[in-house]
């Protein structure tokens, strides 16, 4: 199966990506990881990407599409793949289609903004170990202290409410239009499923909803 996962930052895409990659034995293809790997391996696409990044510019869609095409041609993508963080915009989705990359299902994890702010603003992290907590859903035994070490927990800058709201604004401007784009594509194309799941449900309920919709 070839998937695209859509949803705002904090909607739970990471959790569902882990589930889907395991369930279908497919790799999760993150554009960030691909870029880093291509630059490290000094592939032609990687060298081009590095030039843009060194100049402080965004890497072009053409380069990202080239990286995606190279990556999905690798043997571990024989059963399919899950695209993570791409496409982010309608022009990128058009470019992906024009490049002949076929997708079986687009899964949208739908969570209201207010819930996302609540989820992310409640996160606390133990910097040394990476252990994460949530003041409502997974609180530490002692407020603001790590369970194992008793060290202070911190709130990451990008989990602060005002930062989360800024990220949601960018998501609604750039990425949310993909929802309409892929819904329209699925109506025209019997091979493409568009699945919208209520991401406020418990994790295992979200997983079951996705699997039943894929049948």
Curated annotation (Swiss-Prot):
The lineage of its organism: Bacteria, Pseudomonadati, Pseudomonadota, Gammaproteobacteria, Thiotrichales. Monomer. NCBIfam families: adk (TIGR01351), PRK00279.1-1 (NF001379), PRK00279.1-2 (NF001380), PRK00279.1-3 (NF001381). GO terms for molecular function: adenylate kinase activity; ATP binding. It catalyses: AMP + ATP = 2 ADP. The gene is adk. The keyword Kinase applies. It comes from the Bacteria. It is found in: Cytoplasm. It comes from Hydrogenovibrio crunogenus (strain DSM 25203 / XCL-2) (Thiomicrospira crunogena). GO terms for biological process: AMP salvage. Belongs to the adenylate kinase family. This is Adenylate kinase.
